[in-house]
Regions:
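Membrane-interfacial helix-loop-helix modules of multi-pass inner-membrane proteins that assemble, modify
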Residues: 102-134, 166-168, 179-222, 326, ...
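A membrane-periplasm/extracellular boundary helix in multi-pass inner-membrane enzymes
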Residues: 46, 93, 188-196, 281-336
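Transmembrane signal-anchor hairpin modules in multi-pass inner-membrane enzymes, especially those
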Residues: 1-122, 298, 407
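Loop-to-helix entry and N-terminal half of a specific, functionally important transmembrane alpha helix
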Residues: 181, 391, 400-424
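Membrane-interfacial entry segments at the cytosolic side of transmembrane helices
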Residues: 79, 166-174, 247-252, 290-306
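TM-adjacent membrane-interface loops and short helices in multi-pass inner/ER membrane proteins
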Residues: 98, 331-375, 382-389
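Alpha-helical transmembrane segments of multi-pass inner-membrane proteins
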Residues: 8-18, 145-157, 171-200, 210-215, ...
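Interfacial loop-to-transmembrane-helix boundary motif in multi-pass membrane proteins
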Residues: 25-26, 77-92, 136-187, 413
C-alpha cells in the first residue's frame, strides 16, 4: 500500500467530517469530485489500483449511514426504501451476479477488449493497438463491482441526508464542487502543473499536454479532457437551469464559467453535451417567456447573447478565428470517426454488442470488457436485465414529481442528468 503527501490531509479532513455527521460527509464527497486524479491510496498488489479521494469520502458516508441504519434496526424502527433505491439495488445485485457467475459461464466463449491494465491481446485492426482477449475472470471484475456497490450504497445514504436536510443542501454541495472545479481549471489553464502535481497522484495516464490545432486542452483536476469536459458540462447544465429559474447572479457566474471551461476542454463528447444542453436551455428561454423563466434571467440572456453575437461577428470578419474554429470542429466532430481514436472507440462499442450477442442477452459481467458509450457498456456487461434495471432507476430518480418547494431543483437536476448521459 502506498500513501501520498496529500493522504494525511485527506484522512484528517475525513475524520473531522465523520465527527460532524453525514451531511458534512456528503459535502466533502461533493468537494472531492473535481479531484478526479487525486488518489489517496495506491495498491500495487492489485495491479496498481488507485483509490480516489471521492471514492473514499463516499465510503465514509456509507459507513456512517450503515451504523445509523443498524442502530434503527436494533431499536425496532421501520426503514423506508425509495423505489429508485430498489431499482438501483436490483441493478447492483445483477452486476454482482454477472461479475461472479456470468463471466465464468461464458469464459472462453467470446473475445472482448479487456479493462485490465497492460493487456494488449490480439490486434483486430491496424488503426489502433488495443486488441481482444478471451473472456475470463480478472481483477477488474472485482474492482468494478466494488464501485457499483459503492455507488448504490452512496445513493441510498445521500438520499437519506437530502431527505433530512432538504434538496437545497444538495444544491449547496454542487456549488462547492463547481467552485473547486473552476479553481482547478483556472490553475491548469495558467500552467500551474507543479502545484497540481500534489493532487495528480492516481495511476492514470496524464494528458495535460494534449492540444487541438495548437490550442491546449484544459483538464483541471482530472487526468484528461473528456472527464473534465463531462463534469464541467454537468455544472453548466445545473446552474444554467438554476439561473433561468432564479435569476441569481451566483448561478449565472458558475454557469458561464463552467460553460467556458467545458468549451476549452476541447472534448468531443463534452462539446456535444454542451451544445445539446445549451439548446435545451435556449428552448426553455423561448418557451418560458413570462412563465417559468425569471425576468432578470431573460434580460441578462438578451444582453449576453447580443454581446456574444457582436463579438463573434467581429472575430469572424476581422480575424482568422473562423479558420481556426472550423479546423477544431472538423477535427473533433466530423473527422473524429475516421481517426484512429474514433476507429478504436467504434470497435469498443461494437465489442459491447458482440458480447451481448454471444452471452444471449445476459451480459459477460461487470468489469469484463471495455466498451464505448453508456448503453453499449451496460448491454455488454450486464445485458438486457441489468440495463432495464438501470433505466428504471433513472426514470424513478428523475421522472417523478417533487414537492413544490423542490420542483425547481428537480428541474435543474434533470438538466444536469441529461448532460451526463449525453457526455457518456
Amino acid at each position: 500500500m502506498e500513501l501520498y503527501l496529500i493522504s494525511p490531509v485527506f484522512f484528517g479532513a475525513l475524520a473531522i467530517a465523520s465527527l460532524r455527521g453525514m451531511d458534512t460527509l456528503l459535502l466533502m464527497t461533493a468537494a472531492m469530485i473535481p479531484f478526479g486524479m487525486m488518489a489517496v491510496i495506491s495498491l500495487p498488489s492489485v495491479g496498481g489500483l488507485s483509490l480516489l479521494a471521492a471514492n473514499l469520502a463516499a465510503a465514509g458516508l456509507v459507513f456512517n449511514g450503515s451504523l445509523l441504519l443498524l442502530t434503527r434496526l436494533l431499536r425496532g424502527q421501520s426503514v423506508y426504501i425509495e423505489p429508485a433505491s430498489i431499482a438501483l439495488g436490483l441493478y447492483a445485485l445483477y452486476a454482482v451476479f454477472s461479475a461472479t457467475v456470468l463471466v465464468r459461464l461464458f469464459a472462453g466463449e467470446t473475445m472482448v477488449f479487456s479493462l485490465a491494465r497492460g493487456v494488449q491481446g490480439v490486434r483486430v485492426s491496424t488503426e489502433f493497438a488495443w486488441g481482444k482477449v478471451w473472456l475470463g475472470p480478472t481483477s477488474t471484475n472485482i474492482s468494478q463491482t466494488f464501485y457499483v456497490l459503492l455507488s448504490f450504497c452512496f445513493f441510498v445514504a445521500a438520499t437519506k441526508v437530502l431527505q433530512q436536510r432538504g434538496a437545497a443542501f444538495g444544491e449547496r454541495c454542487l456549488v462547492v464542487a463547481a467552485t473547486i472545479n473552476l479553481v482547478l481549471g483556472t490553475l491548469d489553464a495558467l500552467g500551474m502543473d507543479p502545484l497540481l502535481e500534489v493532487i495528480r497522484t492516481a495511476n492514470y495516464s496524464l494528458m495535460n499536454s494534449a492540444s487541438v490545432s495548437g490550442i491546449p486542452r484544459i483538464i483541471g483536476g482530472f487526468p484528461e479532457a473528456a472527464s473534465f469536459g463531462g463534469a464541467t458540462t454537468l455544472f453548466f447544465a445545473y446552474f444554467g437551469s438554476a439561473y433561468l429559474g432564479s435569476g441569481r447572479p451566483r448561478d449565472a457566474v458558475i454557469a458561464a464559467a463552467s460553460g467556458g471551461f467545458a468549451l476549452f476542454s476541447l472534448s468531443s463528447t463534452g462539446l456535444v453535451a454542451l451544445v445539446f444542453v445549451s439548446l435545451l436551455l435556449l428552448a426553455r428561454v423561448i418557451i418560458g417567456v413570462g412563465a417559468s423563466v425569471a425576468r432578470a434571467a431573460l434580460v441578462t440572456w438578451t444582453i449576453v447573447l447580443t454581446a456574444v453575437a457582436c463579438a463573434i461577428g467581429y472575430l469572424l470578419i476581422f480575424t482568422a478565428t473562423l479558420d481556426v474554429m472550423l479546423a477544431i470542429v472538423d477535427r473533433l466532430i466530423f473527422t473524429k470517426s475516421s481517426s484512429s481514436s474514433g476507429a478504436e472507440r467504434s470497435a469498443w462499442a461494437l465489442g459491447g454488442l458482440e458480447a451481448l450477442r454471444d452471452s444471449y442477452g445476459l451480459g459477460v459481467g461487470t468489469g469484463s470488457l471495455r466498451s464505448n458509450g453508456l448503453i453499449f457498456v451496460l448491454l455488454g456487461s450486464v445485458g438486457v436485465v441489468g440495463t432495464a434495471c438501470f433505466l428504471a432507476f433513472l426514470w424513478l430518480a428523475f421522472g417523478g414529481k417533487a414537492r413544490a418547494a423542490d420542483a425547481a431543483i428537480l428541474t435543474n437536476a434533470r438538466t444536469a442528468a441529461v448532460a451526463v448521459l449525453v457526455a457518456m
